[in-house]
Amino acid sequence: MELKLLQDNGQIGAGVAASAEVFGRDYNEALVHQIVVAYQANARSGNRKQKDREEVKHTTKKPWRQKGTGRARAGMSSSPLWRGGGRIFPNSPEENFSQKVNKKMFRAGMRSIYSQLAREGRINVVDGFAVDAPKTKLLADKFKAMGLDSVLIITDNLDENLYLASRNLPNVAVVEPRHADPLSLVHYKKVLVTKAAVAQIEELLK
């Protein structure tokens, strides 16, 4: 199969040969959903904290005697049943949100994403992608000439000027093939891959 070549003026050029094993697979929506959710979960860190009955600052004195008042028995005001008491199952920063995804499943999911991008015309090959200086304006003007506004660039050799120029653009990311993740692939409207990076992707996902 072939991936379309995108020229600097935004025009589509000749096709570039690509492996059907990576870019020609059927779309598995359930698997893609699973690896995207797992990626988000594994990037999550615990930042919630609630107190249980041991941590709430309350007196441990018994509110009233056990029997004879007609009220329900109570041990202390830090009980989760009381207003201002501790939580029964409090959230903690030590919570583990990670989800395990087997390597075989992950590679199959990534192949499914790349294949769907190719079918939708959202992935194109470029001869190379570089800027002369680490200037955001140079890169922004280049994208404007190509008619792009939301771009993930997958390059075989991460150019420092390109990386620095892209950091201040909100809808642009630059990564190497081994760092391409499922969330970024489905998030950006257009994915640009250098010719050498296509071979690296095929090697990673074979």
From Swiss-Prot:
Residues 43-78 are annotated as: Disordered. GO terms for molecular function: rRNA binding; structural constituent of ribosome. Residues 59-70 have a biased composition (Basic residues). It comes from the Bacteria. Keywords: Ribonucleoprotein, Ribosomal protein, RNA-binding, rRNA-binding. Residues 49-58 have a biased composition (Basic and acidic residues). The keyword Ribosomal protein applies. Belongs to the universal ribosomal protein uL4 family. NCBIfam families: rplD_bact. This is Large ribosomal subunit protein uL4. It comes from Cupriavidus metallidurans (strain ATCC 43123 / DSM 2839 / NBRC 102507 / CH34) (Ralstonia metallidurans). The lineage of its organism: Bacteria, Pseudomonadati, Pseudomonadota, Betaproteobacteria, Burkholderiales.
